[in-house]
Structures are given as C-alpha cells and as structure tokens.
Curated annotation (Swiss-Prot):
Membrane topology qualifier: Multi-pass membrane protein
Cellular component, GO annotation: plasma membrane
Ranges facing Extracellular side: 45-78, 138-161
InterPro entries: CASP/CASPL, CASP_dom, CASPL
NCBIfam families: A_tha_TIGR01569
Localization in the cell: Cell membrane
Family indicated by similarity: Belongs to the Casparian strip membrane proteins (CASP) family.
Highest classification ranks of the organism: Eukaryota, Viridiplantae, Streptophyta, Embryophyta, Tracheophyta
Organism whose genome encodes this protein: Glycine max
Topology feature Cytoplasmic, residues: 1-23, 100-116, 183-188
Keywords: Cell membrane, Membrane, Transmembrane, Transmembrane helix
Subunit comment: Homodimer and heterodimers.
Transmembrane segments: 24-44, 79-99, 117-137, 162-182
Protein name: CASP-like protein 1E1
Length: 188
C-alpha cells in the first residue's frame, strides 16, 4: 500500500506543475501573438486627409493634404519598438520553455527577470502612446494644442486598438511574473 500512496502523491504533485507549464506556454504564446499584432497594427497606421487651411479671411480656405503617420511622434515610435522587443523576447522565451521544460533553474531565473523587464517595458510604452493618444483625442486648451482625432479618426482608432491589444500582452507578461510568485508563496 505504501508504494501506491507514494505514486498517488507523485501524480498529484506532478499534475499542478504540468498545468502551470501549459499555462506558462499559453501565456507566452498569447504575449507573442498580441505584441506581434500590436506592432503590425501600428506599423501600418497611416491616414491622409485634405485639411482646409484659412490663411486670411479675404481668401478662400486652401485644402492641403496632411498625413498622420506613427513615426511622426516619438511616443508612437517607442511604443512600436517596445512591442517589437516584447514580441521577439516572447518568441525566444517560448522556444526556450519548450526546449528546457524545467531542466535548468538558472535559465528560469533569467526568464523570470526578463519577464519582469517586459512588463515594465510594455506598460511604459503603452502609457506613452496612450498619453499622446489622449492629447490627440482631446487636445490641450492650456497650451493651445488642437485635437486631431476629429480629423484623423481612422488613424486614432487604429492606434487605440493597437494600445488595447498591447495591454493584453502586458497583462500576459504580468501573469507570467505573478503566477510563479503565488505558487512559491503557497509552498512556504
């Protein structure tokens, strides 16, 4: 009977670890997918509109084509780069997780530190892009900055979608950091 009990314990201990391993892989796959989508959505974000410019009251308005592009604002460039870095890291860590399968604890420590770095990186990129996006949406009357989303609606909507998708990636990386901490806390 003693041998049967020890086998049951082994199975019970191994099952949560296997579930966590699958959860880890799925979160890494999710982080990879959504950061890739966010980077692609912002990289193709561009809109051209004819904007009437009034030079003088005595002249009719002059329609000038203006183009809104993601690379015209440094916050959007930073946002794209952070998502590209996080996407690349997610792909590499997913491959390492598949190859390693818990063999090297030193590697998992490094991955945990880099996961934490990705959380900070993505949230900072999301915050920067969201701040500029809100300025574009509402403007700032105190410094006489006009809103632009009423003119470049598609551009702003696509940027907002990219930020929302990237936030899902941020949360996936956050869960990759929190789940092992909770698991470690339960063991002690």
């Amino acid at each position: 009977m003693e041998g049967v009990e020890s086998k049951e314990r082994e199975v019970m201990v191994a099952k949560p670890v296997a579930v966590v391993g699958v959860c880890d892989l799925l979160l890494r796959l999710l982080a990879f997918t959504v950061t890739l989508v966010a980077a692609i959505v912002i990289a193709v974000d561009k809109q051209t509109k004819l904007v009437p410019i009034q030079l003088s009251d005595s002249f009719p308005p002059l329609n000038v084509p203006l183009t809104a592009k993601w690379h015209q604002m440094s916050a959007f460039v930073y946002f794209l780069v952070t998502n590209a870095i996080a996407c690349t890291y997610a792909a590499m860590s997913l491959l390492l997780a598949l190859v390693n399968r818990g063999k090297s604890k030193g590697l998992w420590t490094l991955i945990a530190v880099l996961d934490t770095f990705m959380v900070a990186l993505l949230f900072s990129g999301n915050g920067a892009a969201a701040a500029v996006g809100i300025l574009g949406y509402k403007g700032n009357s105190h410094v006489n900055w006009n809103k632009v989303c009423n003119v470049f609606g598609k551009f702003c909507d696509q940027m907002a979608a990219s930020i929302g998708v990237s936030l899902i990636g941020s949360l996936a990386f956050l869960l990759l950091v929190v789940i092992p901490v909770v698991r470690l806390h339960r063991r002690t």
